[in-house]
Amino acid sequence: MTKTSSFSAPKGVPDYVPPGSAEFVAVRDALLRAARLAGYGHIELPIFEDTGLFARGVGESTDVVTKEMYTFADRGERSVTLRPEGTAGVMRAVIEHGLDRGQLPVKLVYSGPFFRYERPQAGRYRQLQQVGVEAIGVDDPALDAEVIAIADAGFRSLGLDGFRLELTSLGDDTCRPRYRELLQEFLFGLPLDEETRRRAELNPLRVLDDKRPEVRELLADAPLMIDHLSESAKAHFEQVLGHLDALGVPYVVNPRMVRGLDYYTKTTFEFVHDGLGAQSGIGGGGRYDGLMAQLGGQPLSGIGFGLGVDRTMLALQAEGKSAGDPARCDVFGVPLGEAAKQRMVVLAAQLRAAGVRVDLAYGGRGVKGAMKAADRSGARYTLVLGDRDLAEDTIGVKDMSTGDQRQVPLGEVVGVLRSELG
């Protein structure tokens, strides 16, 4: 009888196990690589922070803060929260460690789990995996374009092509107050429910992010921020678009876009993939020029993004593509006997030192069982070593794709395999 554990992963928290975890690693690493090629340094952030950091940084009226955060009191009765996003934590770290007093822009990349209490569904988890970048300290449209192009390059390096970039401008401090008044005037004239009216009073932009069809219909004629930009904000956005054109990054201007976090200003963007249905976003971000000062630091600008690793995997699946190599190893060793096992263990260590992924047949499972294990491993080559091979100082090398087997001198096999595996 098969035994089952009485424990399982919490609802909405996925496990990634072999062979599928190879896809996860490939997607994450490709997105990280795109940022590192642009000079972004790695930052590792705490899993939990002071709750006030997110309340102040993300916005107290946002759904993230009011409905989705995992918040609890620690044993010292301090209120802490599992991080729901990365930008606020990065800004806190930049201020705390004085990175803002060095060379600007500060360019950082990070990855890991983030936590939001949402209704679990495909690609929308309570523990979500993201890759993020932040570029802090320079208000330059070219930097906006660089950040966007990094995300675009990361997706394309995976072979993903069914996505599109949507972007808009949310204005700056010189034009947003007047737009806020216009929007509130419009919203207060609608038959809104009490909760939505409260949102309109606190932060009217949050109402534009309402996903309910009946509210979306009421908002059809709402004034748009992009039609009320200041001259400086308009010029900034036009320069961003010009840089994207020069970089060959395709885009669609979506004047109705509203991101779910309060700190965004000016350039705001999202990558969407229609193969994912209603939950089509695979990543997004924008500029947040007032956030650092709001958190107690210098009045420096910033721009960044968060890309969903889980959702990018679903987008690849929707296109019938795969990014990961499910093979656990390049070479699988099958020793026949104790003397052969001792020699094979040493050979495996030599191959690994040469950068070759190697696994061995352990447990005395017999030749037939060992060869089945070799086949399941996905290895390109299987090494077979017995007493006769030891006596002749050779080893059998089987190409698992063709079935061809040859004898190679033991002293040469590391160089031969390294050369053939590239």
From Swiss-Prot:
<dbReference type="Pfam" id="PF03129">
    <property type="entry name" value="HGTP_anticodon"/>
</dbReference>
<dbReference type="InterPro" id="IPR004516">
    <property type="entry name" value="HisRS/HisZ"/>
</dbReference>
<dbReference type="InterPro" id="IPR041715">
    <property type="entry name" value="HisRS-like_core"/>
</dbReference>
<keyword id="KW-0963">Cytoplasm</keyword>
<protein>
    <recommendedName>
        <fullName>Histidine--tRNA ligase</fullName>
        <ecNumber>6.1.1.21</ecNumber>
    </recommendedName>
</protein>
<dbReference type="InterPro" id="IPR045864">
    <property type="entry name" value="aa-tRNA-synth_II/BPL/LPL"/>
</dbReference>
<comment type="subunit">
    <text>Homodimer.</text>
</comment>
<dbReference type="GO" id="GO:0005524">
    <property type="term" value="F:ATP binding"/>
</dbReference>
<dbReference type="InterPro" id="IPR015807">
    <property type="entry name" value="His-tRNA-ligase"/>
</dbReference>
<keyword id="KW-0067">ATP-binding</keyword>
<dbReference type="InterPro" id="IPR006195">
    <property type="entry name" value="aa-tRNA-synth_II"/>
</dbReference>
<keyword id="KW-0436">Ligase</keyword>
<keyword id="KW-0030">Aminoacyl-tRNA synthetase</keyword>
<dbReference type="Pfam" id="PF13393">
    <property type="entry name" value="tRNA-synt_His"/>
</dbReference>
<dbReference type="InterPro" id="IPR004154">
    <property type="entry name" value="Anticodon-bd"/>
</dbReference>
<keyword id="KW-0648">Protein biosynthesis</keyword>
<keyword id="KW-0547">Nucleotide-binding</keyword>
<dbReference type="GO" id="GO:0004821">
    <property type="term" value="F:histidine-tRNA ligase activity"/>
</dbReference>
<dbReference type="GO" id="GO:0006427">
    <property type="term" value="P:histidyl-tRNA aminoacylation"/>
</dbReference>
<comment type="similarity">
    <text>Belongs to the class-II aminoacyl-tRNA synthetase family.</text>
</comment>
<dbReference type="InterPro" id="IPR036621">
    <property type="entry name" value="Anticodon-bd_dom_sf"/>
</dbReference>
<dbReference type="InterPro" id="IPR033656">
    <property type="entry name" value="HisRS_anticodon"/>
</dbReference>
<dbReference type="GO" id="GO:0005737">
    <property type="term" value="C:cytoplasm"/>
</dbReference>
